[in-house]
Amino acid sequence: MKIMIFICGEGLGHTSRCLALGKELLNAGHEIKFGAYGYSKELVEKTGYTAQEIPSEIKLVGKAGSLDLTGSIEATLKSAQLLGGPKLLKLLREFKPDVVVSDSYYLGTLAAMVLKLPVYLIINQSNMEEFFKNRGVPVRIIGKLTKKFYKEVFEKTDKIIIPDYPLPYTVCRKNLNFAPKLRGKLFYSGPLVREKYEDIDSIPLEKPHVVSLIGGFGYREPIFRKVLTTAMLDPGINYTLISGPSLDPSKLGGVPKNVRILNFVEDTYPYIKSSDAVIAPGGHSTIMEALSFGVPILSFPDEGHSEQESNAAVVEEEGYGRMLSYSTPPEVILECIREVIEDEAYRNKVERLQRLSGELDGPKTIRKLLEKEIGKKAS
């Protein structure tokens, strides 16, 4: 099969799971082409693949730990490319894919529909209108239009893939709200993780060890400072902080001896596997990675980001970790760290999800789905 994979470039989690799927499809002998932009395109190319530049779709901005929704809308409109649609149509006509897999990239989804190509949409949120609640009147109007738009798209896609555990273990379940007539299109693949647990070697981290995966947006810097202060309260707990491309670790001031700060790390899996707890925002893909490696989570969702807050709430409710906020003081953060490290109930639950992730094998499951539903038509 020839498969076009479109990737939303806001948030590297979309890219990570598409790379997991692309690797599986390539290993099975299929021809694929990635379409991406921004950090997403850079990560695809750093991994060793080529990526076709596609128009940007959404641009997120924020400050002091909070997502600036109005600013994000303005930034998105300013960066919008008027000829984006024709460019995508040209790309699809030249590549002639048998199927388009779109990870939350709706411009590419629409282009595929125009050309009457099969479309498999990967999403971990369907209730995007929640993003716009309790905002100013113009933003609320955008929310209503958004709901109508997504409803039309969902009805026209061939399949909606949820890259999460099936119910009752679905972490993104609070972000899903589909009409009953769409339930037949839903496919819970299991987590799309780039590496299998058994294929990753552990690294020697001084125990107990907490790994922070907060990165990507400069407005998350307050968490770094909170974690550094937390580390000073108990030198017996060790930390590795992976900063991400938008943060400058040199501006963080004094670093305790029990803390190691690393710049952007391409392969975080050895760190996750070797840790006793992971500090992360509420992003879906990062949570999937931690759970697939059997590690409890301390989640700091971006304030005002309803999708992340909902994911973190499920982590808290199900006992996979704790939900914290940017206002949580270091003393409380430390107690939460001690709790998830010392209480075996957390470890037992996440180890169950680690086993389940391996059994589901999300990338392989989607490959088989495409081969069954598209492969026969393509051959």
Curated annotation (Swiss-Prot):
Top-rank EC class of the record's enzyme: transferase
Lineage: superkingdom: Archaea
GO MF annotation, one: glycosyltransferase activity
UniProtKB keywords: Glycosyltransferase, Transferase
EC number: 2.4.-.-
The UniProt record lists the keyword Glycosyltransferase: yes
Family: Belongs to the glycosyltransferase 28 family.
Name the record gives this protein: Uncharacterized glycosyltransferase MA_0452
Organism whose genome encodes this protein: Methanosarcina acetivorans (strain ATCC 35395 / DSM 2834 / JCM 12185 / C2A)
